[in-house]
């Protein structure tokens, strides 16, 4: 699996791995790259079955497989210890990595994540699946911003959204791969295992997230032994895109604090 690695800003700089959500594209993290590159070696990638890592995914594709293939790719690149920043599905992959490779994951940042899918989130995905089946990729892509962004943010950026729609259609991961990745997301359940995650965790959520209620992050916070929760008042599900200034400040401060906390505990 292909990875994109930034040059380390200094010798032995900590590594931060960015894992996007269901869309799978590493470019989702573009608003974070410039600030992270100054302090960390940053790893981005298109998830298997998407972008520049095309593949046909098995029907039983799982979050555990997503975690294993990423860890194997990191080890092949010479990276054995790393912090993880995951958004939604990416946060699930991050938790799986922390469970399966505890010696490798130094810190986990969960952005609008959850222990197991909430009934409201499931309903949103059911509606989106119906759109996919009835209207194809175009209907799926055109509906996506409604679940990602605040209304006023979208209203002020109509040309940008049109350009994003065209790009998403051109690089659509395919119906079968999308549904198999979505099914993996829906099957994931960390409610009985989260207390085994020992690395420090920063939880970031947005109070106006239409797709994932903030209660999901509260449940995560209660279940994880060593976690802190930060709530953004604005930004929607893709809060790192819509309000990068606020998000980046939370992320940089959180990573610095938790990595120091981790080193002090060793």
UniProtKB/Swiss-Prot annotation:
Keyword terms, alphabetized: Hydrolase
Spell out the reaction equation it catalyses.
carbamate + 2 H(+) = NH4(+) + CO2
Entry's Gene Ontology BP terms: nitrogen utilization; uracil catabolic process
Q: Which InterPro entries does this one have?
A: AB_hydrolase_1, AB_hydrolase_fold, AB_hydrolase_sf, Pyrimidine_utilisation_RutD
Q: Name one Pfam family in it.
A: Abhydrolase_1
Membrane-crossing residue ranges in chain numbering: none
Enzyme type, top EC level? hydrolase
- List the EC numbers from the record: 3.5.1.-
Please give one Gene Ontology molecular function term for this protein: hydrolase activity, acting on carbon-nitrogen (but not peptide) bonds, in linear amides
Q: Describe the task this protein carries out.
A: Involved in pyrimidine catabolism. May facilitate the hydrolysis of carbamate, a reaction that can also occur spontaneously.
According to its UniProt record, which protein family does this protein belong to?
Belongs to the AB hydrolase superfamily. Hydrolase RutD family.
In Swiss-Prot or TrEMBL terms, this protein is called: Putative carbamate hydrolase RutD
